[in-house]
Design a protein with these regions (language model features):
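Extracellular loop-to-transmembrane helix junctions
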Residues: 1-19, 72-102, 111, 122, ...
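Hydrophobic, membrane-embedded alpha-helices of multi-pass small-molecule transporters
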Residues: 48-64, 207-215, 224-287, 332-344
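Extracellular/periplasmic helix-exit of transmembrane alpha-helices
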Residues: 99, 209-221, 275-319, 386-393
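Membrane-interface loop-to-helix entry segments
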Residues: 5, 9-27, 129, 145-149, ...
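Helix-loop-helix module between adjacent transmembrane segments
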Residues: 10-11, 15, 56, 90-106, ...
């Protein structure tokens, strides 16, 4: 429990200390923000700072810091270190610069930002990559909640249309269309802060429940510094890929421009972007602690946690909430596993619309132009979702690549931020170091992960245990990271001029 409290204190202190260092490095000033300068009444709308924070928190969080943290807890309390230091030195830095670089470039999407600082090829790669990723995220967060609602009705003894996934999927997709189409302050600006508060209350309730109930004890890092994973899965780099939301996640860079278009002052950036990521880190720390504390540890392995997660991640959330908060926990759990994914799904589709609008220079003030992009974006999501509900389409194979692509996206954004800081003649090491680290993570996982090259190289024992060839993968990961750092240092020696700043037709 002591190590948990130390990590919690470090996270909070990190916001005030290192967050200030990051802010001073960027150098916010009193220039006119896109929300004030453009103010189209749709995507560029000035919102109060507290709403910006709550919306950003819910955009980047959803159930990510809960699911990911509990999966990460399979490795034991060592995951506390990744959540804490990953958030302070990588995730919050990533979120801050993805938001503030966007703000400095008229609220540009992350694909356009990547193009400005990493070149035209990377821009086009990121455009396609971002749209595909966002539509996939939006679709998954439509199908998942629809299935959970069906389960609730079936468990309550209901029959008929309300027990069909297709019925609820259509309702969720209709809501997504409305939220993607209308002004950001009409739905997202009004209900997101409420759900953001619920997400925080749920984490506080779980934390209090662990502390006040004597049967639960959070294990110490120094007592379980090695891996406690029941399947013997290596800490490096699997834990760093599994725990994305709650440490560092490339998906956040697609969401930060939404709030960059709604800020009244650049000086709100630290609270909105860095602060929201630290808050997500705290939430992840609480849920990781719950995963370590509530379930049986056998022979130094988290076997009890593995068993509850085998019943489904939603079941695990429900179980934790009930054990720590009783009947109140049931209501919060249902709200969490249904509302939180939906609030991530609608902004994923909204971000996809904005990426396309920046790509094809389509002004979004006119409703016809928004409709022009909303229809195909939601149409693809509907085809995937309905096809999956009817058993015609199985996109889970593609979705398995999300974990790796998510962290690779974070790596790319950090390298873009490093180039930005170089051009601004500022300390680029605060982004280049985590960029190098994430390059090693992504490269190592690409060699080890069963979704990637691991499916051709890893082998299983007679007992079905996967054996990972870490002796080859680890040096490869380090070599790739050193190579990328070398390319970056070589590039900044050759470049002496500022990149072309695009206005994106705004």
């Amino acid at each position: 429990m002591v190590s948990f409290l130390i990590c919690l204190a470090l996270l909070i202190g990190g916001y005030f200390v290192y967050g200030k260092v990051v802010e001073n490095t960027f150098g916010p000033d009193d220039r006119e923000t896109p929300a004030v300068k453009i103010n189209d009444g749709v995507d560029y709308v000035v919102l109060p700072q507290w709403k910006l924070f709550m919306i950003q928190l819910l955009n980047i969080a959803g159930l990510g810091p809960i699911f990911g943290a509990m999966q990460g807890a399979l490795w034991g309390p060592i995951v506390f270190l990744w959540i804490t230091f990953g958030t302070i030195f990588a995730g919050a830095v990533h979120d801050y610069f993805s938001g503030m670089m966007s703000e400095r470039n008229n609220g540009a999407s992350i694909s356009e930002i990547s193009g400005i600082y990493l070149g035209g090829f990377m821009k086009n790669v990121m455009r396609v990559f971002s749209v595909v990723l966002l539509i996939m995220v939006g679709t998954v967060f439509a199908v998942g909640p629809a299935g959970l609602i069906v389960t609730l009705f079936k468990n309550g003894g209901s029959t008929g249309i309300v027990t069909t996934t297709l019925f609820w999927l259509i309702i969720v997709l209709v809501y997504y269309f409305i939220a993607t189409f209308i002004s950001i302050d009409k739905i997202i600006g009004k209900i997101y802060p409420i759900f953001g508060i619920c997400l925080i209350v749920m984490a506080v309730g779980v934390a209090v429940g662990i502390f006040v109930k004597p049967e639960y004890t959070i294990p110490e890092i120094w007592d379980h510094f090695g891996s406690m994973h029941p399947k013997g899965t290596p800490v490096w780099s699997f834990m760093f890929i599994t725990v994305a939301c709650g440490a560092i996640s490339g998906f956040h860079s697609t969401q930060s421009p939404l709030m960059a278009r709604c800020m009244k002052s650049e000086k709100q950036g630290r609270f909105v972007f860095y602060g929201a990521m630290v808050s997500e880190g705290v939430i992840a720390l609480v849920w990781a602690a719950a995963g370590c504390a509530l379930y049986e540890v056998t022979g130094g392995l988290n076997t009890g946690l593995a068993e509850i997660l085998a019943n489904g991640q939603s079941a695990a959330i429900y179980d934790v909430c009930v054990k720590t908060m009783g009947k109140v926990g049931v209501a919060l759990a249902m709200l969490g596993v249904i509302a939180c994914p939906i609030t991530s799904g609608d902004t994923a589709f909204r971000s996809a619309r904005l990426v396309l609008s920046d790509w094809f220079k389509i002004d979004q003030k006119k409703w016809k132009n928004r409709l022009l992009l909303c229809v195909p974006v939601l149409g693809v999501g509907a085809v995937l979702g309905v096809g999956n509900a009817l058993g015609f389409i199985d996109y889970t194979v593609i979705w398995r690549y999300f974990s790796w692509t998510n962290q690779t996206l974070a790596m790319i954004v950090l390298w873009a931020a490093s180039m930005y800081l170089y051009y601004e003649k500022k300390n680029y090491w605060i982004t280049a170091v985590p960029a190098t680290f994430m390059s090693a993570v992504s490269a190592t996982y690409f060699r080890l992960g069963n979704e990637c090259l691991g499916q051709f190289i890893n082998h299983k024992t007679a007992e079905g245990v996967t054996v990972y060839n870490t002796a080859v993968a680890y040096p490869i990961g380090i070599a790739v990271a050193v190579l990328f750092l070398g390319i970056f240092l070589y590039t900044i020696k050759k470049r002496h001029t500022q990149p072309h700043y695009e206005t994106l037709g705004k």
